[in-house]
Amino acid sequence: MALLRHLLPVLTVGSAVQSAVLVQDQFQTRCENFAGKIDLPNVKVNFASYIPGSTNLTLDNVPTCDQSQVVSSDICRVAMAVTTSNASEITLEAWFPRDYTGRFLSTGNGGLGGCIQYSDLDYASRLGFATVGANNGHNGTSGEPFYKAPEVLEDFVYRSVHTGIVVGKQLTKLFYDEGFDTSYYLGCSTGGRQGFKLAQDFPGEVDGIIAGAPAINFVGLLSWSAHFYPITGPVGSATYLSLDDWDLVHEEILRQCDGLDGAEDGIIEDPDLCHPNATTLLCSPGATSGSCLTATQVNTVHEVYAPLLSSNSTLIYPRMQPGGEQFAAPAMYNGQPFQYSKDWWRYVVYSDPTWNATKWTIRDAEAALRQNPYNIQTWNADLSPLRDSGSKLLTYHGLQDQLISSDDSKLYYHRLMKTMGVTSNQLDEFYRFFQISGMAHCQDGDGAYGIGNRAETEFSTEPEDNVLMAMVRWVEEGIAPETVRGAKFSDGVGSEVEYYRKHCRYPRRNVYKGPGDYTDETAWECV
């Protein structure tokens, strides 16, 4: 009898193991047989493969896209080509997790790419989402595939993500007997613009959109990116500032503006209050540069922080927010034309691969704005259809963003209120915007940028600390986020968290009230 009592736990454990193996085998078998079950218009399945967690995938990609990706959890990986016109197709992947939560999610892209965001596919599938991602209708990060190829360009503007969602939802229903309960979109930068395109042109296609650092006002953005080269000139010109010079400018901006939020912590909480005066850095007579700037360089700084206006003084794009100079200088003020802008005018605006980007003028911006193919501006300020659909949109923008000015997101917010005739509180019912102090472009930065918008910023999956899960709670429980809590890492994700800070819902801003020091999250208040 005693022997039997000892055997029972063993038998129970063995049965559990056998059951787990059986479930896993069923999932793997379902995956390996899945390709033969897919019969959708315009969809050609390349393969459906079971990928166990911890696998390091080698990706068949062009050199400018990801070459490998560690898969965090067991998935069924489905790769396919989807025809979008007689002259275009997208490469689409769906990652179906074994530990499925009944949620569907589409990822976005970045830059002018061209590249499936495999890290986002892994991040969302690890969290239990059936996840899709596409290559935006072309391969690589260059704009050259747009050259005399309007169908490829149309895929880039909107059709790739929309098609991926339509096909992805069908596949999810086919793969899982229970289908899906809720649907989401997650993207940043170009991915942010794609999220806004969904909101503007396909309201209700997903239940929740997380759209970070959005490249909306897209042609204005590329014009703004292009206009820095005429301001700074090439390396070595009188108007050019070295990286050391920009470090000097950054320290002076902090001296003038850091304390305006109540704490000197190297982070500017509200750039709207900061209007840098670079004349304080002007070299005295006889002084050598290195710890000061020439009058010509001072003028360069002031021009960099001015908005971009058309030839008739109409706003094209707002100013670069001050406070992120150490990130912006190597990317935007490096003495070379900005690559994405150069590609846009060469392969889209003028269809002339020999066009000289160093000759860019405001007239080129105006020509591009008149063109605006497929309304890539993504600047429609009436989101009434999105509101009426019941869908939610959460957007965020880093206040040290070096590639897309956070002022553009604020400009759009105010355009929404004016166009729709609503108050901030009314907008909050379906649209919330969070300024993330100390965050550069979509990730990294000097402050509490760990908000879970991607794997590279994740420290928690609690809704208070993770924008994706905050959206899930908003959609599924009706609890909208009041703040987004970010983590300041000592040395990137996975390192020690130095402090936390709650980022405010716009138009509120963070103010240090004390009594603790600036690392105490309770010492800050949204006002």
From Swiss-Prot:
Cysteine pairs bridged by disulfides in the record: 31-76, 65-115, 188-442, 257-274, 283-292, 504-526
GO biological process, one term: xylan catabolic process
Signal sequence, start to end: 1-19
Lineage: Eukaryota, Fungi, Dikarya, Ascomycota, Pezizomycotina
Top-rank EC class of the record's enzyme: hydrolase
Single GO molecular function: carboxylic ester hydrolase activity
InterPro entries, sorted: AB_hydrolase_fold, Tannase/feruloyl_esterase
Glycosylated sites: 56, 86, 139, 277, 312, 356
Protein's UniProt name: Probable feruloyl esterase B
GO cellular component: extracellular region
Family affiliation: Belongs to the tannase family.
